[in-house]
Amino acid sequence: MTVRTRYAPSPTGSLHIGNVRSGLFAYLFARRYGGAFILRIDDTDQQRSSKESLDEILASLRWLGIDWDEGPPDPAYFQSNRLGRYRDAVRGLLKAGMAYPCYCTPEELEAKRRQAEREKRKPVYDGKCRELPFDPEIALPQPGEARSCAIRFRTPRDGETIVEDLVKGRAVFANSELDDLIIFRSDGLPTYNLASVVDDIDMRITHVVRGDDHLPNTPRQVRIFEALGSAPPQFAHLPMVLGMDGKPLSKRHGVTSVFAYRDAGYLPEALLNYLARLGWSYGDQEIFSKSELMEKFDLANCGKSAGIFNSEKLLWLNFHYLKERPIAQLANEIKPFIEKRGYPVPTDDGWLQMAVATLRERAKTLVEMAEFAHFYLSAEIDLDPKAANKFLTSQVLEPLRALTETLDSSPSLKLCDRRHPSDPSQREREAASALQEATQLCGPAASDLIHRCMAASAGNSADPLQLLADSAQIVEKLFTGVLARFNLKLGQLAQPVRVALTGGTVSPGIFEVIAVMGRERTVQRLRAAVARIEAQSRPAAE
């Protein structure tokens, strides 16, 4: 038997996290056993369905890396294009005596429901129209046509319906508790239970993987499968996804749609990994690539209890994938988030890779990374008043002034400034003095270092991270010289410099920050800090 699973979202809104997890499990099960994954669009509710929702659903699945073997854009996989098939199925059930017309009005049914509630009974259809004679050739209402009757399925009154669920185990339902559900509405449209069964038969679905909120529908669907002459597929009902408060995951728990997480700066690999582990386990392993999931996933390892959506765990996973991401890919992915914050997107991909390399050790999302990049991207920054008052004081005025002049006059640092590169002819003229300084600072390795810096600052390097390392090495040597001159420890000068360059007290390593920021902007901000200290140190005018 070839495994065939399906996922059937309705295009009536965004793709919900709990919903897409069911689709993911169906997808992984099909991939594990070399089967086919079918995407079907349940769009019979044309009033609520929209092209925008459909486009978002398809884009969400593609973003997560969930691809389908059969489905859109093929029109055969849209329920709205299969209405004739459902009508044929209903006619067959009517002729076989397995369905009958129901003339009860909505008002009658509502009154009976309220009466059952008052008597503390389960509200089920009482079968008023079940034994009425009818013409099996009765004309079915057309879509949009208001008729006086709906069509109900004739559920057996005696015996039991048994569902051998691959996750929940055996579930036994008394047929007397299963009312005669409506399978074809008076407006000419099929109900979910009929359309789903007919589609599963026609699409040769072998395994139905879905949330356990569908479990009450399952015995009814099993009976419809049998009435249509088809063996039901195997069912796997997954426990619901709950919030940390133990309630069903909803908007009150924060972002719940796939695209909301994308827009919040999560990587698809992180969300896919997290959703796969939400109700499924493989030993103690937490990190799974997509290929590992397809290799190891099995419904037998799905838990029976509800999955708790832990946003901190998802953040932890996202942090892991950010750190493991190829730097060039990460730099490209952060661009929309930079633009959204109102900054011009850097055109130098190499420089952006350098910046991202310093930021990803702290950022848990792409949104955070773009926020942290503000001091690199802004022409001017605002200093945190508390930090500035604490660290930009007269005690560091002379060391700060000395560092400013040291960095400004450094030919090797100027050569490494990819953010503000010199023109080619000037770089050639400056190379000799840069090499001389670098040799004094870095020893015999200086020649290779300077040649790499020349190539990288000109945009010719295949490895911007090497330029970052080389530039940071030069900065460290220059910094160390100033520390020795004033007999200071690193923190005594590094923190004032950090405040001057970034506006705050937390940043990546200060040598790397200077390397990315470049000599020109670094010197500009240090001079502004020196001027601030000088202004505050002057006696107040009489």
For the regions a language model picked out, list residue spans one by one.
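Short acidic, glycine/Ser/Thr-rich loop/turn "cap" segments at secondary-structure junctions
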Residues: G71-Y77, I205-T206, V255-S257
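Short beta->alpha junction loops/turns
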Residues: Q46, Q79-R82, P156, G211-H214, ...
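Glycine- and acidic
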Residues: T5-P11, L39-D43, M203-V208, T256, ...
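N-terminal Rossmann-like or analogous alpha/beta NTP/dinucleotide-binding catalytic cores
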Residues: M1-E119, N217-S230
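Acidic active-site catalytic centers that drive phospho-/nucleotidyl reactions
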Residues: H16-G18, D42, D180, N193, ...
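Conserved nucleotide- and phosphate/pyrophosphate-binding catalytic cores
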Residues: S49-K51, D55, L64-G65, V172-N175, ...
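Active-site cores that bind ATP or allylic diphosphates and position pyrophosphate for catalysis
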Residues: Y100-P101, T105-H237, L242-L249, S257, ...
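Hydrophobic alpha-helical segments in the ANL/AMP-binding
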Residues: Y27-L28, L61, N193-A195, V497
